[in-house]
Each structure stands twice: as C-alpha cells, then as structure tokens.
C-alpha cells in the first residue's frame, strides 16, 4: 500500500525573522580577490582611490549586507598593523596561508572606505592563529575608540577622525582545521576566544562577537567542537 504525503503551504506563517546578514559575503587576500579584483590602481575602471568602479557597481546591485575581512585562512598569519598608515611605508611580507607575497597596499582603512562605497556593513576577523588578546584589543581601540589613546589617536593621524564603530567581529577562522596557521583544539580555542572577547568588550561593550564553528560536517570533532567552544564562550 502506497503512502501518500501531504504538503501544506502557508505564506503568512512565520517562525522567526531571518537575519539579513545571512546573505553576507567576505573578501580575502587570496589570488585576485583583492588585488585586481576590487582594488587595482591604474586600471581604466579604477577611481581615485584605486577601487574598481565596475566591481563596486556589481556589489551594489547584489546589495550584500555585510562583508567579512581580511579572511579566511589569510587572517591567521596577518598583522593588522601592516595595513595601516602611508602605503609607501608598509612592509611587504611572506604570506603563509596561500604561499604568496603580501604588499599590504590594501589594508584596514582601504577596506572600510570600500565598504562605505558599496553600502555594506563591515565584519572584521581577528587573528587567533599567531596572535591573540593584545592585538585584538589594540585593533578595536584603533577602529572604535573616539580618541585620547595611542591607537585611536594613530587612526586620526592617518586621516580618519571619527571612529568606525564596527559592530560585528569574528574571532579567528576555521581554528579546528589542521591546515590553519595556529590550529587549536576546541578547549584551547574556546578559552582564547572567551578571553579575547572579554578584553575587546572592555574597549567597546556594544560589539557583537562570532566564534568559529566546525569547518565542515566531516571534521572528526564535528559537534563536539561546538559544544566545547560554546561552554567557554556562550
């Protein structure tokens, strides 16, 4: 005897409101994503800041609500300080995640200027691979503190008087993966994420922080990772 299934549709029935940020994206220093992707000084389609106008128009058309930066695996070996200040004074580094050379011509302030132009909210990722609490608290002081401290005053010296007031932050990237620079156990990552969050909120209590879940459901620590990390952070 065949079993018949019935499906009832009710377009007015709602369980909850969908967070529009689920339609967000991210940009990483990988391949041509940044250099010659969104940023290419001298290109016929580049504006005075080096941003590709044709790419910006496409992103505006997509109406991407939020964009994460600078990665991705890239963030786990990244020193955010390398990407601020006069471009000609920025260091060129060996980039270990994707085995390339990073010029740091495009950094934090360029990203913030670019997101403002495309109408997307920024989401900054914190390096919890090779760095941690100190670098994170300095970064949020640079971006979110009004002034009167070393890092906030340095932002002003770089030409950005008003704080960015970045609200959404990601604590690391795929930290469960052995491919990640500074790969950690769930216990190690959970404790570091919790302490980093604590320090960042002392600088700005209004921020929203996101921890890393499992990279995919085939990871040997899948589900156990989430339970352990959240036991420290939630």
Which residue stretches match the model-derived regions?
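Non-catalytic accessory regions flanking glycosidase/transglycosidase catalytic cores in CAZymes
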Residues: 1-234
């Amino acid at each position: 005897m065949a079993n018949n299934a019935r499906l009832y549709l009710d377009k007015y029935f709602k369980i909850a409101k969908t967070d529009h940020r689920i339609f967000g994206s991210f940009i990483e220093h990988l391949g041509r994503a940044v250099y010659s992707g969104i940023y290419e000084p001298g290109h016929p389609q580049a504006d005075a800041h080096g941003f590709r106008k044709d790419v910006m128009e496409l992103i505006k058309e997509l109406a991407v609500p939020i964009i994460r930066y600078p990665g991705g695996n890239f963030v786990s070996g990244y020193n955010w300080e390398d990407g601020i200040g006069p471009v000609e004074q920025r260091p060129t580094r060996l980039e270990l995640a994707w085995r390339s050379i990073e010029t740091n011509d495009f950094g934090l302030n360029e990203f913030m200027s670019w997101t403002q132009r495309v109408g997307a909210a920024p989401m900054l990722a914190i390096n919890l691979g090779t760095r941690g609490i100190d670098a994170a608290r300095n970064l949020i002081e640079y971006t979110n503190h009004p002034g009167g401290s070393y890092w906030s005053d340095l932002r002003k010296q770089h030409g950005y008087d008003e704080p960015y007031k970045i609200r959404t932050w990601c604590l690391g990237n795929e930290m469960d993966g052995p491919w990640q620079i500074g790969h950690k156990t769930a216990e190690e990552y959970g404790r570091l994420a919790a302490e980093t969050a604590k320090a960042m909120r002392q600088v700005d209590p209004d921020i929203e922080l996101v921890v890393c879940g499992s990279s995919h459901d085939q990871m040997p620590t899948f589900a156990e990772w989430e339970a352990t990390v959240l036991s420290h952070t939630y």
